[in-house]
Curated annotation (Swiss-Prot):
Ligand binding (DNA): 300, 319, 324
Region Head domain (RuvB-H), annotated ranges: 264-354
Region (Large ATPase domain (RuvB-L)): 4-190
Protein name, as recorded: Holliday junction branch migration complex subunit RuvB
UniProt KW keywords: ATP-binding, Cytoplasm, DNA damage, DNA recombination, DNA repair, DNA-binding, Hydrolase, Nucleotide-binding
Pfam families for this protein: AAA_lid_4 (PF17864), RuvB_C (PF05491), RuvB_N (PF05496)
Entry's free-text remark on domains: Has 3 domains, the large (RuvB-L) and small ATPase (RuvB-S) domains and the C-terminal head (RuvB-H) domain. The head domain binds DNA, while the ATPase domains jointly bind ATP, ADP or are empty depending on the state of the subunit in the translocation cycle. During a single DNA translocation step the structure of each domain remains the same, but their relative positions change.
Region (Small ATPAse domain (RuvB-S)): 191-261
GO molecular function, one term: four-way junction helicase activity
Task performed by this protein: The RuvA-RuvB-RuvC complex processes Holliday junction (HJ) DNA during genetic recombination and DNA repair, while the RuvA-RuvB complex plays an important role in the rescue of blocked DNA replication forks via replication fork reversal (RFR). RuvA specifically binds to HJ cruciform DNA, conferring on it an open structure. The RuvB hexamer acts as an ATP-dependent pump, pulling dsDNA into and through the RuvAB complex. RuvB forms 2 homohexamers on either side of HJ DNA bound by 1 or 2 RuvA tetramers; 4 subunits per hexamer contact DNA at a time.
Length: 354
């Protein structure tokens, strides 16, 4: 898992933050209210209604679960929810809450209607999760005082609050935890026009000169992810300041992204390495995940968690009962002729591999 996180941090088109410096940069560009939030129209519309209703009743917003791929704005929405409700936000993450006391300390310091944001909520330990259940339902927690035979349970009342949980792996949440969220929202990948709007907004905040075609060129290579779009914008801005008098046009963006090995559909060297291995070493597939990992010198987890999701989502890769298979789009992308349909049908005949 450490190697997977390391690779994700090193890729310019990775959807996870690459450093604490980048997190500071993200905060500077983060929209502060729902009206400024681009994309996710369905989720945004729902939150507008639920937040306004809660404010009219002077109640905390129902607990909110946000899930979807990294980099799509879950943390941003948590901050916006707190700001729209006019309350404080306390932020933590699942791995940080190692003991029940860690969570109890956070909960007992919340003021009325505050928002507690737990990122990576699927990584909460079972003992911490058990403490959370009564807090979510009854605004109470039970803590143990003392040790051994003298230990006793003390019930503490909490201020009403809203939990906003964020996860990239909703399937890893336990059913009891998932059932305690009154509002569940999935964030989807953005289209190029939405990302171009985000790029133009970010460029304005950075005092970068960009024309609509330059913003669209960056957007098309951003893998449907605002975090990647903003990261690419920073690098293209650097290139433009040195090579193009600070003017970001489509041609300048294309040259900058080519220098970074980000191709017109957002693939980098690792994406191309994986797809080319399937095409050339395994005749387009099917190939089992372990064989593929050995062929490209990467860990299985890295392929499944870092490389594959976008390739599958965009239709360049398929998981079949017999392994990974390159699609017609992949052959076209690399300028190759696809095998005839008769050969492809054989991929699905008998389950084998992983």
């Amino acid at each position: 898992m450490i190697e997977t996180d390391k690779l994700a941090a090193e890729r310019i088109i990775a959807a996870t933050p690459s450093s604490s410096h980048e997190e500071v940069f993200e905060r500077a560009l983060r929209p502060r209210q729902l009206d400024d939030y681009v994309g996710q129209e369905k989720v945004r519309g729902q939150l507008e209604i639920f937040i306004e209703a809660a404010k009219r009743r002077s109640e905390p917003l129902d607990h909110v679960l946000l899930f979807g791929p990294p980099g799509l704005g879950k943390t941003t929405l948590a901050h916006i929810i707190a700001r729209e409700m006019g309350v404080n936000l306390r932020q933590t993450s699942g791995p940080v809450l190692e003991r029940a006391g860690d969570l109890a300390a956070l909960l007992t310091n919340l003021e009325a209607n505050d928002v507690l944001f737990i990122d990576e909520i699927h990584r909460l330990s079972p003992v911490v999760e058990e403490i959370l259940y009564p807090a979510l339902e009854d605004y109470q927690i039970d803590i143990m005082i003392g040790e051994g035979p003298a230990a006793r349970s003390v019930k503490l009342d909490l201020q009403p609050f809203t939990l906003v949980g964020a996860t990239t792996r909703a399937g890893m949440l336990t059913n009891p935890l998932r059932d305690r969220f009154g509002i569940v929202a999935r964030l989807e990948f953005y289209d190029a026009d939405q990302l171009a709007r985000i790029v133009r907004r970010s460029a304005s905040l950075l005092n970068a000169h960009i024309d609509p075609s330059g913003a669209l060129e960056i957007a098309k290579r951003s893998r449907g992810t605002p975090r990647i779009a903003n990261r690419l914008l920073r690098r293209v801005r650097d290139f433009a300041e040195v090579k193009a008098d600070g003017q970001i046009t489509a041609a300048v963006a294309d040259a900058a992204l080519a220098m970074l090995d980000v191709d017109p559909v957002g693939f980098d060297l690792m994406d191309r390495k994986l797809l080319e291995a399937i095409l050339h070493k395994f005749d387009g597939g099917p190939v089992g995940i372990d064989n593929l990992a050995a062929a490209i010198g990467e860990e299985r987890d890295t392929i499944e968690d870092v490389l594959e999701p976008y390739l599958i989502q965009q239709g360049f890769l398929q998981r079949t009962p017999r392994g990974r298979v390159a699609t017609l789009l992949t052959y076209r992308h690399f300028g190759l002729s696809a095998p005839d349909a008769g050969n492809e049908r054989g991929m699905w005949d008998t389950p084998a591999g992983k």
